[in-house]
A protein has these predicted regions:
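Anionic-ligand binding patches
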Residues: 2-12, 16-200
Length: 200
């Protein structure tokens, strides 16, 4: 199978934040389709890795729509919590995708591990796996990551997910405080997308 240039792609996510960020990364000449006109539920994420779950979702939505699909699986790893929440990052937010709840859970678990954690840097990283799948397209599966630390409290209202508690390495503010144009030049999703940009 030849790797033809992609001119139309389905973004396999129901997460509005992810959809917005991925859409911003894809060249304007490419027609981007969302899942808003489909009634399918998200597939069960049964893999133990980000790359495995991204591919699982790309295959599922490609077969559902009959089109080439790009899917994302991403999350936050915190060293003090043995790399949790990791692949379960979204699930920590509950059925209603309440990331305020997820952030409170993170802080609570860190507190249980180390009551003096605010006096030191808690190492963490964001990871993003991107997979492209289509019937006549050779599968692509890549990962990007950015190292950083957990902030002492929730800061900022931009972005989504765990952005308000993650300070990327070399910066003094959280992703939640950053302007989107700044975040999108350094984050894990941008780093993963750089590896697949040539296919568009």
């Amino acid at each position: 199978m030849q790797r033809q240039k992609i001119r139309e792609i389905v973004i396999g996510t129901n997460n509005k934040g992810k959809l917005r960020e991925i859409r911003d990364l894809i060249p304007k000449k490419v027609k981007v389709l969302s899942l808003k006109n489909t009634t399918a539920k998200s597939p069960k994420e049964t893999s133990k890795t980000f790359k495995g779950n991204a591919l699982l979702k790309a295959k599922y939505y490609s077969k559902l729509t009959g089109k080439i699909c790009l899917a994302d699986d991403s999350g936050l790893e915190i060293d003090l919590l043995n790399k949790a929440p990791g692949i379960y990052s979204a699930r920590w937010s509950g059925k209603k995708n309440n990331f305020n709840l997820a952030i409170k859970k993170v802080i609570k678990k860190i507190n249980l591990k180390d009551k003096n954690w605010k006096k030191r840097n808690i190492k963490a990283r964001f990871k993003c796996a991107l997979a492209i799948y289509g019937t006549d397209f050779k599968t692509v599966n890549v990962i990007g990551k950015i190292e950083g630390t957990i902030s002492k409290k929730k800061l900022g209202s931009r972005g989504f997910g765990y952005d308000p508690i993650f300070i990327p390495i070399g910066k003094k503010i959280t992703f939640g405080q950053m302007r989107p144009e700044m975040k999108h030049k350094i984050d894990h999703r941008f780093k993963a997308f750089k590896k697949i940009r040539k296919f568009f």
